[in-house]
């Protein structure tokens, strides 16, 4: 495995950092990043290595405000900015000597699976998009939503007075997001992340303001001329398979594939025993539509 530390600029002046896994010859490339408040070290490096072994160059980078990438405040998530960063990551890869600029795939996992789709709808340089277990529902439980929005407005007032941003846990001890977003996490799996040095179990309260304002569904109709594959684990308890399928059905692009993976959940659909079969189908999709 050959891996390089790389960095690239965004249009608004940040530096995003990640790992480049160069292929053996000039050809296709994948631009890949992680989900909500999650650094690149979790789950995806093995996936990047697998694609590299198939001859595909891969960029796996930290989203802004996360991990090694720039951005303040830390652990602040702005979905619309993550879409823009996909464009700038693609620009970086298109200039790389190992990359065929007409064969660049956006690859998103979990939260970034939706930002990848929106980016693909807005950027016709994208050769194809692979959306793995997308977070497809942005509804919040009413009580928690009202509380967190009140706190977010208080935080804005406080920030203008010169105070530090307010943070809340990403996932509480009960496995639920305290802002009322989404379903319960498997705490046995989640605690494995908590024991690492690179994962921080907190997010700015403003992140949930931005998520509530994030309405990606309308952008699905913009995906035309870009092949799309959605990979949905049938046992996903974090993002409903029915919600994921509903998003898939919004996409007008005829060259689209829906891969419903039996017996897998949100956090093991592309990792662990049996995952190679899932990755092989993704590779076949890429080869079919990008001709390599």
Curated annotation (Swiss-Prot):
Annotated region (Abhydrolase domain), positions in chain: 46-267
Uppermost EC category: transferase
EC number: 2.3.1.-
Pathway(s) it belongs to: Secondary metabolite biosynthesis; terpenoid biosynthesis
Alphabetical GO biological process terms: fumagillin biosynthetic process; terpenoid biosynthetic process
Induction description: Expression is controlled by the fumagillin biosynthesis cluster regulator fumR. Expression is also under the control of the developmental and secondary metabolism regulator veA.
Application of this enzyme or protein: Fumagillin and its derivatives have been intensely studied for their potential use in the treatment of amebiasis, microsporidiosis and rheumatoid arthritis. They have also interesting antiangiogenic properties by the irreversible inhibition of human type 2 methionine aminopeptidase (METAP2).
SUPFAM superfamilies, alphabetized: alpha/beta-Hydrolases
Keywords: Transferase
Database matches in PANTHER family: DLTD N-TERMINAL DOMAIN PROTEIN (AFU_ORTHOLOGUE AFUA_8G00380)-RELATED, SUPERFAMILY HYDROLASE, PUTATIVE (AFU_ORTHOLOGUE AFUA_2G16580)-RELATED
Function as written in the Swiss-Prot or TrEMBL entry: Polyketide transferase; part of the gene cluster that mediates the biosynthesis of fumagillin, a meroterpenoid that has numerous biological activities including irreversible inhibition of human type 2 methionine aminopeptidase (METAP2). Within the pathway, the polyketide transferase af380 catalyzes the transfer of a dodecapentaenoyl group synthesized by the polyketide synthase af370 onto 5R-hydroxy-seco-sesquiterpene to produce prefumagillin.
Protein name: Polyketide transferase af380
Source organism of this protein record: Aspergillus fumigatus (strain ATCC MYA-4609 / CBS 101355 / FGSC A1100 / Af293)
Organism classification: Eukaryota, Fungi, Dikarya, Ascomycota, Pezizomycotina
């Amino acid at each position: 495995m050959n891996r390089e530390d790389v960095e690239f600029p965004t249009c608004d002046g940040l530096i995003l950092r990640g790992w480049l896994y160069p292929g053996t010859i000039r050809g296709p490339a994948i631009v890949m990043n992680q989900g909500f408040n999650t650094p690149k070290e979790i789950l995806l490096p093995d996936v990047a290595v697998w694609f590299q072994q198939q001859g595909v160059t891969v960029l796996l980078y930290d989203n802004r405000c996360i991990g090694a990438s720039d951005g303040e405040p830390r652990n602040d998530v702005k979905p619309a900015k993550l879409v823009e960063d996909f464009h700038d990551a693609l620009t970086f890869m298109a200039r790389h000597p190992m990359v065929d600029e007409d064969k660049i795939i956006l690859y998103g996992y979990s939260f970034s699976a939706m930002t990848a789709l929106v980016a693909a709808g807005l950027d016709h340089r994208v050769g194809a998009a692979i959306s793995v277990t997308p977070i497809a529902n942005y509804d919040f439980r009413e009580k928690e939503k009202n509380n967190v929005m009140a706190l977010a407005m208080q935080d804005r007032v406080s920030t203008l007075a010169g105070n530090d941003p307010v943070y809340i846990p990403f996932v509480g001890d009960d496995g639920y997001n305290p802002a009322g977003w989404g379903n319960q996490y498997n705490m046995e799996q989640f605690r494995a992340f908590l024991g690492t040095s690179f994962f921080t179990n907190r997010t700015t309260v403003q992140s949930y303001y931005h998520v509530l304002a994030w309405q990606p569904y309308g952008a699905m109709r913009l995906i035309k001329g870009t092949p799309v594959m959605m990979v949905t684990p049938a046992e996903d308890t974090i993002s409903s398979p029915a919600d994921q399928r509903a998003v898939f059905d919004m996409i007008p692009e005829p060259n689209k594939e829906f891969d419903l993976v039996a017996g897998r959940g949100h956090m093991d659909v592309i990792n662990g025993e049996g995952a190679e079969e899932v990755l092989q189908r993704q590779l076949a999709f890429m080869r079919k539509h990008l001709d390599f």
